[in-house]
Amino acid sequence: MSVNRMKKRILLLLLVIPALIKAQDVMTETRQELTSPDGAYRFTFYQRAVGEDNAQMYYTLTYKNRPVIEESKLGVLIENQLFESALGIPNDTCHFWCENLKLTETEHQKTDERWKPVYGERAEVRDCYNEMTLKFKKGEGKGNRDGGYDKRKNYFMNIIVRAYNEGVTFRYHFPEMTNGLFLHIVGEQTSFTMPEGTMAYYERWAQGPYELRPLKGWGKEESERPLTLKLPDGLSVALLEAEMVDYVRGKFR
């Protein structure tokens, strides 16, 4: 065997091994998919193992089998240690709050109805989408009852995903805790990993001037939303935020 051929085989082996490792740490039992009514959009959710007991949430999005959002993280950043300590509830040991969420149930439903707006260009609007609700639980009921107060730590979180023919949405939903525990949200892990070569119409403030620039090299600069993007394959994407009623507005960094 020549030296060159040996180098090629070694290189091939080195390339294959990381790919196998990456595939193996995907928890296949958590993989869930949702498609739009016309089948064009496909949202895929799954978790990857982080150590022995924890897992990180990820998602991808394709349009007609073309990548729109590559593997990206899902999750919120929550700091409850001080509140839990004050109540005598065991603190979390995971690095991120969402790392030890267990997927307990997945619900699917379809909606196709019409509603009449108060004003606008159309007298009737069709509301047609497929919905998937991912239900998570945190904690295994560890703790005790002290003087009637339930000190067992059980948190619940849902991710509600809707796929329309026009696009895909998702939101975090926190059902009310039965023992009065609340959540101190300090940030998000939510990310949008776009294909290499994507360009963004950067806007520093609302109604400010637009600047077409690469996604790299922003530093600490932030862009207003919605953020319009041009993918290298010709697709255009808009990242939006909705129902800003009881939550802070976001920016893209």
Task: For each feature predicted by the language model, list its residue ranges.
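Bacterial Sec-dependent N-terminal signal peptides
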Residues: 1-29
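N-terminal accessory beta-strand-rich subdomains and adjacent acidic, glycine-rich linkers
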Residues: 27-253
